[in-house]
């Protein structure tokens, strides 16, 4: 189906366009598309920046730009740097709501509403350019240009991956990924529109949301990533989605075999992995077999520098810096070239080590690297709920010993990490990548502070925080080496520092009153901390609770100068 045929067919469709908080038919969507397209044409808009949380609004804005001949620019996020980029590049900013921080015209979705559409309203389509940001391996944003015809061709290629048995059920397409990136754009937006499948409007970024939302529809497809799919556990109410999920599509990294097995057993039999990049589009897929299969339009060559690919969708040859081993029935990915390192004359694939440890029931996510200040390996590990329980029960040394032994079954001693850091979650971005600065800090800096999950000022004299105890707290070492708990003196240190951060305390308190430690504070505990200030009596009371259990409480007497200043 050409882009013109696709457009003509959808313009006549009576089917559902999107669903979620509210549903839209294709006819309703076409009315909004035509109205926005007319606005863009009337105002001679040549370049539009698009940033949306609502998938329906995004799709409408994209199609309106196609009709109006307006090129599209997709920021990966709304950082200050990207805001400046938009201001210097585009004529208008299209989003769910007006952004008053941008110094360019902004048009919210509420301004596009139109109630009627007829075939006579349909305009010619234009092969507009769509610009996406990608960080690649450097962490610095690059601009990648696609055009509308290429995006339609990508959708056509991808449609062949889904079995007819999946498509015939007309499943609703659910996504945990962002439409601001190539993966979300291709699969959530283009593929669903190409196949005429209804798209769920909201992004579902937690496993619980995917499960609950799946139950609301007869059949669904999940568009997700290993980052989220690796978090599924038996502790989730898996039964909610049973019988509702027709297929799971995953991209952005390798899906660990244990997670694939879990999905096959509890979610659905069709688990489809996609390999590619923003530059190349989708390159290969893997479904129910050990090896990857190239898409039909891909021509390729393998060298020591990686995998070079070219296609109708990527006419300039692109080098993917991944080590590849060809087999008779496909190929295997060994990981990025820069993630195959040499230690003591031994070639070691860091991805292979990660994949092996991902099989362990204690490991939810992992990143292994050569230590920034040494010649040995370091591992940054996010533990599963089971792993956290064992951490609290047995301690850090036992966890490391068990993971090393698990890895040693198939790896030489030189490949076993000597430096370990543990956490509850690795801070991956929407493309499943880690910021190199975060990795460096995690490996080199001791963990001494709590994680502030949320905070707000309730009133002028009451402040609330929700904090989490880090797994790998430096203060667990020594006296609390086996049974990890936060010493009382450290709890008080945190309280004073948090009061200083919210500007309630500058100097050291004069004294402490009515101090009580009632329950242990342990690794990964999430607690609420409430400060109440009495300026007349020159005191700040604090109470730390976990659910209904009191952990710590007391009062600080503050200097005269601070109570007067407040």
Each model region followed by its residue ranges:
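Conserved pre-ATP/AMP-binding loop-to-beta segment of ANL
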Residues: 8-12, 110-133, 165-173
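Conserved AMP-binding A3 loop
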Residues: 25, 129-156
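Conserved AMP-binding/adenylate-forming
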Residues: 38-78, 170-179
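AMP-binding/adenylate-forming
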Residues: 89-98, 145-164, 168-231, 247, ...
């Amino acid at each position: 189906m050409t882009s013109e045929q696709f457009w003509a067919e959808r313009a006549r469709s009576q089917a559902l366009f999107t669903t979620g908080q509210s549903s839209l038919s294709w006819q309703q969507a076409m009315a909004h598309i035509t109205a926005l397209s007319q606005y863009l044409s009337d105002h001679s808009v040549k370049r539009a920046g698009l940033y949306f949380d609502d998938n329906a609004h995004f799709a409408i804005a994209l199609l309106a730009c196609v009709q109006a001949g307006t090129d599209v620019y997709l920021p990966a996020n709304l950082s200050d740097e990207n805001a400046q980029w938009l201001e210097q590049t585009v004529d208008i900013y299209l989003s769910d709501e007006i952004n008053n921080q941008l110094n360019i015209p902004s048009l919210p979705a509420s301004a596009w509403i139109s109630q009627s559409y007829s075939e006579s309203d349909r305009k010619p389509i234009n092969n507009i350019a769509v610009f996406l940001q990608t960080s690649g391996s450097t962490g610095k944003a690059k601009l990648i240009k696609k055009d509308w015809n290429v995006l339609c061709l990508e959708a056509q290629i991808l449609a062949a991956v889904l079995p007819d048995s999946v498509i015939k059920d007309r499943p609703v397409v659910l996504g945990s990924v962002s439409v601001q990136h190539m993966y979300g754009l291709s699969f959530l937006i283009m593929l669903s529109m190409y196949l005429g499948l209804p798209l769920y409007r909201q992004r579902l970024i937690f496993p619980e949301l995917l499960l609950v939302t799946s139950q609301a529809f007869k059949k669904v497809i999940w568009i997700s990533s290993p980052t989220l799919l690796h978090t599924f556990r038996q502790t989730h109410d898996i039964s909610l989605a049973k019988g509702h999920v027709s297929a799971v599509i995953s991209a952005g990294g390798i899906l660990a075999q244990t997670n694939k097995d879990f999905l096959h057993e509890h979610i659905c039999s069709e688990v489809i992995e996609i390999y590619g990049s923003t530059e190349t589009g989708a390159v290969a897929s893997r479904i129910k077999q050990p090896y990857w299969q190239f898409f039909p339009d891909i021509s390729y060559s393998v060298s020591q520098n990686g995998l070079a690919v070219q296609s109708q969708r990527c006419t300039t040859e692109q080098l993917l810096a991944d080590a590849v081993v060809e087999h008779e029935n496909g190929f295997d990915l060994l990981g990025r070239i820069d993630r195959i390192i040499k230690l003591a004359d031994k070639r070691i694939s860091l991805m292979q080590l990660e994949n092996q440890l991902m099989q362990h029931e204690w490991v939810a996510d992992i990143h292994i690297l050569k230590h920034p200040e040494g010649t040995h390996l370091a591992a940054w590990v996010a533990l599963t709920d089971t792993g956290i329980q064992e951490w609290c029960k047995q301690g850090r040394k036992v966890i490391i010993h068990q993971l090393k032994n698990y890895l040693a079954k198939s790896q030489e001693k030189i490949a076993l990490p000597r430096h370990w850091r543990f956490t509850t979650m690795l801070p991956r971005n929407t493309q499943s990548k880690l910021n190199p600065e975060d990795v460096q800090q995690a490996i080199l800096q001791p963990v001494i502070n709590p994680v502030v999950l949320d905070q707000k000022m309730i009133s002028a004299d009451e402040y609330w925080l929700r904090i989490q105890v880090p797994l790998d707290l430096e203060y667990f070492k020594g006296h609390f080496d086996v049974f990890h708990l936060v010493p009382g003196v450290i709890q008080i240190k945190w309280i004073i520092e948090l009061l200083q951060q919210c500007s309630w305390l500058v100097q050291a308190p004069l004294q402490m009153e009515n101090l009580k430690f009632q329950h242990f504070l342990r690794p990964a505990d999430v607690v609420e901390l409430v400060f109440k200030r009495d300026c007349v009596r020159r005191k700040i009371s604090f109470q730390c609770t976990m659910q209904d259990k009191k952990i710590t409480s007391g009062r600080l007497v503050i200097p005269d100068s601070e109570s007067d200043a407040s």
